[in-house]
A protein has these predicted regions:
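Alpha-helical transmembrane segments and their immediate interhelical/interface regions
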Residues: 15, 19-34, 92-116
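N-terminal juxtamembrane cytosolic/stromal segments of multi-pass membrane proteins
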Residues: 1-81
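Hydrophobic, aromatic-rich alpha-helical transmembrane segments
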Residues: 57, 85, 89-101, 105, ...
Length: 229
C-alpha cells in the first residue's frame, strides 16, 4: 500500500490519485523511451518498473516479448541438439525467427496470468497489462544477449553450436564457456528483474517476490523438458 503525502490515507501500490482527498500522489507517465528505460533497469530497476507500470502506453512490450521468444527458441534448439536433425544453419535460424515471436507472446501472457492469479491469492490486485509489461521489460538482458552474444556464437561455432558431433565445447572450449556463461548471466539477471518488477508492481516482500521470480524461471525451464526430435 502507498500512503498519501497530503492526507495520510492508504491507497493501492500504484495509485496516482488519492481515493480520499483526490490529490495527485505521483506524476503521470504517458509513454516509455526504450533506451532510457533499458538503462534504468540496470541503474534503478525498482523506480523504472514503477514507471513502466504507471505508463499509460506500454511501448515496446510486444517486440520485447517476441525477441524473448526467439531467444528461448534458440536455447531450446541448443538444448535439444537440433542441428543433428536439421543440419542447415539457415533453416534452423529461420525456424527460430518464425516460431520465436509466437512462443514469446505465449510465454509472457501465461506468466502474466499466473502472476495475476497468484497475487490475487495474496490479496494483491494487479492489472494484466502491467504484469505483461513488467515481464516483457524484465527480459531485456536476454534480448541484449540475443542481439550481441548469439551472433558471436553462430560466427564461432556455426551449425555445430546446435550439434553434438562434435559438441561446441570441444571445438573451442574457452569461447563456449565465455559465451554460454554470458547467456546464463543474462538469463539469471532477467529472473532477478522479474522479481524486482513484481515487488515494485504489487508491494511484495523480498521473499515473496523471489519465490514468484523462481516460479517464472521454473515455468520457462519446463519448456526444456519438451522433446523436439
Amino acid at each position: 500500500m502507498t500512503t498519501c503525502p497530503v492526507c495520510g490515507a492508504a491507497n493501492e501500490e500504484l495509485a496516482v490519485v488519492c481515493t480520499s482527498c483526490k490529490g495527485f500522489m505521483r506524476a503521470k507517465v504517458d509513454t516509455l523511451d526504450l533506451f532510457h528505460t533499458m538503462w534504468g533497469l540496470f541503474e534503478a530497476p525498482t523506480a523504472t518498473f514503477r514507471r513502466i507500470a504507471l505508463s499509460r502506453i506500454k511501448n515496446y512490450t510486444i517486440p520485447l516479448s517476441c525477441c524473448l521468444g526467439i531467444a528461448i527458441a534458440f536455447m531450446l534448439f541448443w538444448n535439444a541438439n537440433l542441428g543433428v536433425a536439421i543440419p542447415q544453419l539457415t533453416t534452423l535460424i529461420g525456424l527460430g525467427i518464425l516460431t520465436g515471436p509466437f512462443l514469446g507472446l505465449a510465454v509472457v501472457t501465461l506468466l502474466a496470468l499466473w502472476a495475476k492469479w497468484l497475487l490475487r491469492r495474496m490479496d494483491r490486485k494487479i492489472a494484466f497489462r502491467n504484469a505483461f509489461a513488467v515481464l516483457a521489460y524484465a527480459a531485456v538482458p536476454v534480448v541484449i544477449s540475443l542481439v550481441i552474444v548469439f551472433p558471436l556464437e553462430i560466427a564461432v561455432f556455426g551449425i555445430y553450436f546446435f550439434d553434438k558431433n562434435p559438441p561446441p565445447i570441444v571445438l573451442n572450449p574457452v569461447a563456449f564457456i565465455i559465451l554460454v556463461g554470458i547467456d546464463a548471466i543474462a538469463a539469471g539477471w532477467s529472473v532477478v528483474l522479474s522479481g524486482i518488477g513484481m515487488r515494485a508492481l504489487a508491494g511484495l516482500s523480498r521473499l515473496r517476490s523471489g519465490i514468484l521470480a523462481l516460479s517464472f524461471a521454473a515455468g520457462i525451464g519446463g519448456l526444456f523438458l519438451i522433446p523436439l526430435r
